[in-house]
C-alpha cells in the first residue's frame, strides 16, 4: 500500500509530558481497579460467598488491570522505542493486539453485567423470558469461565498467528522536501487486519449489551409509571436499584464508545500518517476511560463504598494518632 507519510517530530517536552500523564493514568487506574479486585477477592479468601454481580466485578477488574498495563507499555514503546520513520516493531504490534483482546473481554463482561441486572431487576411476564432470566442467574459463573477461556484461546491464536506470519517490508523512499517521504510498508497491514478482526468480533457482545440495557431502560419507565399511579413514596428500593444499574451501564457505554473511537482514529494516525502526537492523545483517552468507569462502579456499589469509608476512617485515625504522638513528644521536650 502506497501512503504519503509526513514525519512529525516530537519534542522532548511533549514526550515527557505524555509519559507523566501516562504514569498518572496508570497509577489511578491500577489503584481503582486493584481496590475493586482486592475487596471482592478478600471475600473469597475468607470463604464468604460472592454474589453474581461481585463475580462479574472481580473479573472486570482483572481485565481492566491488564488493559492499563498494556496501555502503559504502549505509551513507553511509543515514546522511547518506536521511531516515526520505521515500520511498527513486533513488540508494539503485539501489545496493541493483546489490548484488543483484553478490550473485547472487557466488553463481554460488561454484557454479562447488563444481562445480570436484567435478570435481577426486570419483572418478566412471559414464561420464556422468566426461564431465560433464571438461566442467566444460574449460569453466570459458567459464562464468566467461558469468557476467560475464549480470551485466553484468542490471545494464544493471535500471538501465534502474528509471529508465525512472514513479516517483510518494502520501502520506497522519494524525498519531496525536507520532511516528506513516500513509504510502501506491507508489514503494518498485519496490525490493521488484526484490529479489524477484533472489532468485528466485538459486534455480538455490543449488541447484547445494547439490547439488555434497553430492556432495563424500558423496565425503569414502566416502574416509574406504576409508582405514580399506586404510590407516592419517592424512596423505592426497586427504583433506586434500576437507577444505579443504569448509571453503571450508561457510563460504560459512554466510556467504551469514546475509547473505541480513540482506538479507531489511532490506527490511520499510526499506520498512514505517522502522527505520533495524535496517537499519544488517543492512547491517553483510551487509558482514562477504564478508570472513569471503575470510579462509577465504586460509587454505585454498597460494599465498595463501605470499604472506601473504612479506609478513609482508618487513614484519618492514623493521622490523628501521629499528630497526638508528635504533640506529646514536644510537650515532654
Curated annotation (Swiss-Prot):
Instruction: Supply the alphabetized keyword list.
Output: G-protein coupled receptor, Glycoprotein, Membrane, Receptor, Sensory transduction, Taste, Transducer, Transmembrane, Transmembrane helix
Q: Assign the protein's first listed, main location to one coarse class.
A: membrane
By its UniProt entry, which Pfam families does this protein fall under?
TAS2R
Molecular function terms from GO: bitter taste receptor activity; G protein-coupled receptor activity
Annotated glycosylation sites:
178
Instruction: Kindly report every residue range on the membrane side named Cytoplasmic.
Output: 39-55, 116-142, 212-251, 298-333
Q: What membrane topology term does the record carry?
A: Multi-pass membrane protein
Q: What else is known?
A: Most taste cells may be activated by a limited number of bitter compounds; individual taste cells can discriminate among bitter stimuli.
Q: Which purpose does this protein serve, as stated in its record?
A: Receptor that may play a role in the perception of bitterness and is gustducin-linked. May play a role in sensing the chemical composition of the gastrointestinal content. The activity of this receptor may stimulate alpha gustducin, mediate PLC-beta-2 activation and lead to the gating of TRPM5.
Q: What is the protein name for this chain?
A: Taste receptor type 2 member 38
